[in-house]
């Protein structure tokens, strides 16, 4: 009885980010579409060869995307937003939807990018589909079918992957009031019927249809819609219904009624669901078990997994499939490239290529292959050895964590009192202007960083180079007349990796890249041991920048929850414990910054929303320790020290009270793409502190006009008292260039100055009317 082995998807970026560099060359006009497509084809061919060489039963097709797989589905369904429809859709259409289009690059008019948000609770992003009641769907984008043909012609047995119709609808948004996007399902299903019919003609036996929303707590109309949907799209192609990121037990009674041929569940995220799934699995279905974790870098304990799966194999026989838990796009590509790791540390890890081999090894061992069973035993030994490694567990760190009290997570006085102290010290105008932290990482900075890391630049030479970039950033900000400055973070390759490199307990990699969105890749550090700060990290750079200006300089820290969410965490201790260790380290940094004369300190927490568990019933437990971790970090600040925090891609409605519970003096948030829609959360909740809703979408090359910014700030002022508003971009400016950055910030500053005058006139008029009324009554 041969066990079928497969994965849900493979990284598309290339082991050395080949796709990223090709995309960016294309966007700069340095290569044409044919050259870009050639790079994509080469990457797909290599990925399929990796899967086939390892011995997987299927090569997965359709997991490749030029920007993100949800946007690919949008193009597949012919569902391009009207503002981006210019002739027959091609790659430029796809990039316009994802990146937007400025007037200068379009003969007609500019067009805003579609919203972008996080893919469930990961650090991957997708472009949000837009729905209106007139929408139709038509299969017009051939990428999926072309890639199936490519794989077949290369000699592979193919399993295409497709985002399911219910998940596609659910992950989108209505762009008009009084309309429910679920009513579009019948039209959408017609397109899915056409897709499956085409795949059948191509000789496809199995298709993987991803419905990750089945791991959520779905409302009844959405859950009920599944039965009809899968009856309608039933075809000659067998369907593996794929779920991941959490348990599907809540939806299981509906799932087992569906007209599909198999179910995939994520046992890495929710191992407890196995018994319930086995008890209700239809007799004619296959069961794919995701036992190799696609979201981390840790070597799988294949010995333990084998012991767990053997009874399932005995019960199901060939109906048992072994798989990755989710797509491997969340893992780096290949551990073999990491020549700088010690043999011990290397033995702890497995990247995507190695995870493919783990899946195959488990399949062979389940089939009774003696050599594979023995290999499982040997392969798992480093995991056991690590549990007792003395350098992984530190008594000093454990002692501090054990001493945490409620008082440690509280500022010394309430916000109202802090605000008075801060107003006296900072002397800021109405609608103060600032940026979120980073400035463009120029090619010069990257070359110098590379030269330093390769030994071509000494530490002293590199420090002088960085000081030059900091001085330049300060000079540019003063010329723009921003109110609160930043040093620009020239020394930081990444907002998380930089702290990981300067905190004990982390391991960084050279090629551990994963895709975040589009061409944006991140290289998450790995938590390998207890975390502690051995010396100040940012104080020197911030104090140098402050010495160059009389304006206020913000110290810039990445918060404990974001560092946790944007790294690969340990699996031997809880996420809460890691967050507490990080919080204590950052608390020490806050103390040192204020002692060095930095009056404003930003503790970025852009990832706090994405860290929420998928099930709402699990939210409060997470929020309790996540908010505590932030407050521990910030609570060493004196009343006159203003603590800022920043969040992006956040949906605040469900966590607005928790955002307030952070007790940050100022919060800046991403709102420009949604045209200030995110501020609806503040209509019913009286947010007590200051807020800076973003007015410049830094993810798009478009430069916002002064009028656009004025309009956004006025919308914000309808929900937030103007005296508590700040004016700032959505996010850091690292990925932009200096000309567009300065142009956008010039408009931002001029908009703020114009609005100060307008609001001052309104205030004067109101005061005059009030005075006249008093005099009349007198």
UniProtKB/Swiss-Prot annotation:
It holds the Pfam family Meth_synt_1. Its cofactor is Zn(2+). The active site is at 699 (proton donor). CDD domains: CIMS_C_terminal_like, CIMS_N_terminal_like. Binds 1 zinc ion per subunit. Its EC number is 2.1.1.14. The keyword Repeat applies. Pathway: Amino-acid biosynthesis; L-methionine biosynthesis via de novo pathway; L-methionine from L-homocysteine (MetE route): step 1/1. It catalyses: 5-methyltetrahydropteroyltri-L-glutamate + L-homocysteine = tetrahydropteroyltri-L-glutamate + L-methionine. L-homocysteine binds at residues 436-438, 489, 604. One of its GO terms (biological process) is methionine biosynthetic process. L-methionine binds at residues 436-438, 489, 604. Signal peptide: none annotated. Keywords: Amino-acid biosynthesis, Metal-binding, Methionine biosynthesis, Methyltransferase, Repeat, Transferase, Zinc. One of its GO terms (molecular function) is 5-methyltetrahydropteroyltriglutamate-homocysteine S-methyltransferase activity. 5-methyltetrahydropteroyltri-L-glutamate binds at residues 17-20, 118, 520-521, 566, 610. Zn(2+) binds at residues 646, 648, 670, 731. Catalyzes the transfer of a methyl group from 5-methyltetrahydrofolate to homocysteine resulting in methionine formation. HAMAP family: Meth_synth. Belongs to the vitamin-B12 independent methionine synthase family. This is 5-methyltetrahydropteroyltriglutamate--homocysteine methyltransferase. The lineage of its organism: Bacteria, Pseudomonadati, Pseudomonadota, Gammaproteobacteria, Vibrionales. The gene is metE.
């Amino acid at each position: 009885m041969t066990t079928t082995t497969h994965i849900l998807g493979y990284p598309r970026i290339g082991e050395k980010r080949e796709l990223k560099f090709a995309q960016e060359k294309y966007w700069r006009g340095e290569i044409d579409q044919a050259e870009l497509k050639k790079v994509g084809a080469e990457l797909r061919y290599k990925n399929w060869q990796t899967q086939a060489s390892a011995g997987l039963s299927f090569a997965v097709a359709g997991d490749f995307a030029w920007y993100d797989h949800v946007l690919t589905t949008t193009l597949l369904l012919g569902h391009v937003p009207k503002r981006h429809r210019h002739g027959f859709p091609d790659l430029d259409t796809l990039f316009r939807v994802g990146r937007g289009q400025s007037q200068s690059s379009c003969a007609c008019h500019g067009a805003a990018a579609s919203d972008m948000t996080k893919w469930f609770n990961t650090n991957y992003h997708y472009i949000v589909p837009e729905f209106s009641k007139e929408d139709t769907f038509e299969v017009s984008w051939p990428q999926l079918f072309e890639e199936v043909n490519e794989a077949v012609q290369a000699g592979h047995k193919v399993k295409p992957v497709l985002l399911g119709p219910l998940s596609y609808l659910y992950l989108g948004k209505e762009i008009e009031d009084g309309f429910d996007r679920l009513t579009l399902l019948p039209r959408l299903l017609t397109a899915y019927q056409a897709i499956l019919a085409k795949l059948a003609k191509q000789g496809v036996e199995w298709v993987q249809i991803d419905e990750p929303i089945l791991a959520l707590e779905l409302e009844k109309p959405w859950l009920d819609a599944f039965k009809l949907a899968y009856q309608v799209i039933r075809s000659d192609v067998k369907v593996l219904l794929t779920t991941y990121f959490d348990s599907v037990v809540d939806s299981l009674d509906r799932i087992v009624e569906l007209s599909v041929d198999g179910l995939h569940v994520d046992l890495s995220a929710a191992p407890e669901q196995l018994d319930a799934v086995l008890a209700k699995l239809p007799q004619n279905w296959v069961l794919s078990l995701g036992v190799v974790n696609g979201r981390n870098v840790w070597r799988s304990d294949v010995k333990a997994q084998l012991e767990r799966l053997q009874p399932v194999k005995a019960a199901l026989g060939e109906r048992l499939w072994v798989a990755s838990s989710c797509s491997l796009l969340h893992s780096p590509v290949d551990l073999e490239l990491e020549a700088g790791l010690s043999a011990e540390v290397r033995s702890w890890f497995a990247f995507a290529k190695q995870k493919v081999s783990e899946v195959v090894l488990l399949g062979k061992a389940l089939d009774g292959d003696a050599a594979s069973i023995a290999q499982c035993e040997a392969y798992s030994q480093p995991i056991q050895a690590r549990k007792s490694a003395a350098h992984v567990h530190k008594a000093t760190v454990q002692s501090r964590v054990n001493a945490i009290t409620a008082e440690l997570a509280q500022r010394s006085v309430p916000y109202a009192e802090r605000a008075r102290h801060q107003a006296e010290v900072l002397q800021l105008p109405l609608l103060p202007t600032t940026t979120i932290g980073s400035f463009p990482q120029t090619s010069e900075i990257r070359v110098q960083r590379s030269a330093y890391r390769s030994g071509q630049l000494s530490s002293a030479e590199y420090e002088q180079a960085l000081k030059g970039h900091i001085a330049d950033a300060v000079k540019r900000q003063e010329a723009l007349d921003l109110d609160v400055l930043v040093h620009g973070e020239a020394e930081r390759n990444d907002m998380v990796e930089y702290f990981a490199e300067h905190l004990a307990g982390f391991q960084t990699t050279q090629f551990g890249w994963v895709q975040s969105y589009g061409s944006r890749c991140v290289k998450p550090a790995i938590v390998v041991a207890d975390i502690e700060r051995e010396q100040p990290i940012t104080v020197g750079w911030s104090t140098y920048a402050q010495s160059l200006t009389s304006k206020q300089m913000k110290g810039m820290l990445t918060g404990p929850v974001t560092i946790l969410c944007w790294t690969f965490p340990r699996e031997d201790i809880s996420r809460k414990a890691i967050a507490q260790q990080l919080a204590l380290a950052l608390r020490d940094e806050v103390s040192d910054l204020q002692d060095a004369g930095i009056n404003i300190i930003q503790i970025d927490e852009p990832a706090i929303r994405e860290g929420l568990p998928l099930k709402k019933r699990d939210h409060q437990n997470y929020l309790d320790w996540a908010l505590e971790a932030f407050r521990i970090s910030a609570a060493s600040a004196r009343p006159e020290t203003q603590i800022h925090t920043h969040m992006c891609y956040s949906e605040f409605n469900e966590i607005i009270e928790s955002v307030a519970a952070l007790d940050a003096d100022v919060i800046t948030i991403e709102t420009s793409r949604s045209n200030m829609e995110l501020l609806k959360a503040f209509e019913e909740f009286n947010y007590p502190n200051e807020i800076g809703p973003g007015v410049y979408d830094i993810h798009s090359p478009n430069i916002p006009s002064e009028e656009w910014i004025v309009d956004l700030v006025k919308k914000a002022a309808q929900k937030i008292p103007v005296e508590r508003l700040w004016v700032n971009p959505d996010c850091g400016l690292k990925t932009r260039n200096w000309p567009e950055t300065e142009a956008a910030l010039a408009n931002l500053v001029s908009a703020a100055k114009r609005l100060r005058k307008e609001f001052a006139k309104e205030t004067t008029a109101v005061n005059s009317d009030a005075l006249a009324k008093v005099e009349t009554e007198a």
